[in-house]
Regions:
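SAM-dependent transferase fold signal centered on methyltransferase-like domains
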Residues: 1-187
Length: 187
């Protein structure tokens, strides 16, 4: 009820709820900005533990604001939400390069792994990700292959694949679900 009241959107408690929540938050911010003819585009977004952070670029103009609103929609019964990109690849590259140069940040292995994951994830043009354990359970696939093996098989089929920062068992990919299930069933 709080999500409907505060963000004018319907949430879902499922494996991608953190990404869904982030996208609902972005949409709400964009709606408020659009009232003032401002178009806000995410350049860096993440959900970690119980926190969500969104950094946005502000472009002025009613036409630009209208274009942003066209990228709102539903996903798996949740939303409406932002269905555009969560990251600007150029900004992610700069953040990663600057972090590597920094004596403080470069020694923080957890931070560097987190940034690397987001950098890879930002290259995939997909909304949502695949929860491998959930897919295997739902489709009665008894043995799950290693995640790295699955990602390599997806890439061999010509699709993109990376880890997702939203969930450790998740894979972000542009592969259709039916092809992923077939891949998981074939060992």
């Amino acid at each position: 009820r709080a999500c409907i009241r505060k963000y004018w959107a319907l949430p879902r408690r499922d494996s991608i709820m953190h990404e869904t929540g982030l996208r609902i938050l972005i949409r709400k911010i964009q709606l408020v900005a659009a009232q003032y003819d401002k178009a806000l585009t995410p350049v860096f977004s993440y959900s970690k533990e119980h926190y969500m952070r969104v950094f946005l670029r502000n472009d002025k103009g009613k036409n630009k604001a209208d274009e942003i609103l066209k990228l709102h929609g539903m996903l798996n019964g949740a939303g409406p939400m932002w269905l555009g990109k969560l990251w600007d690849i150029n900004i992610i590259d700069k953040i990663c390069k600057n972090s590597l140069k920094s004596r403080i940040f470069s020694k923080n292995n957890e931070l560097m792994k987190f940034l690397k994951t987001i950098k890879e994830e930002s290259k995939i043009n997909a909304v949502g990700f695949y929860d491998l354990n959930g897919i295997c359970e739902k489709n009665k696939i008894k043995k799950l292959q290693k995640k790295e093996t699955i990602k390599n098989k997806i890439r061999k089929l010509g699709y993109k694949a990376s880890d997702t920062h939203f969930k450790s068992e998740g894979v972000s990919s542009d592969i259709p679900l039916n092809k992923l299930i077939k891949l998981l069933k074939n060992k």
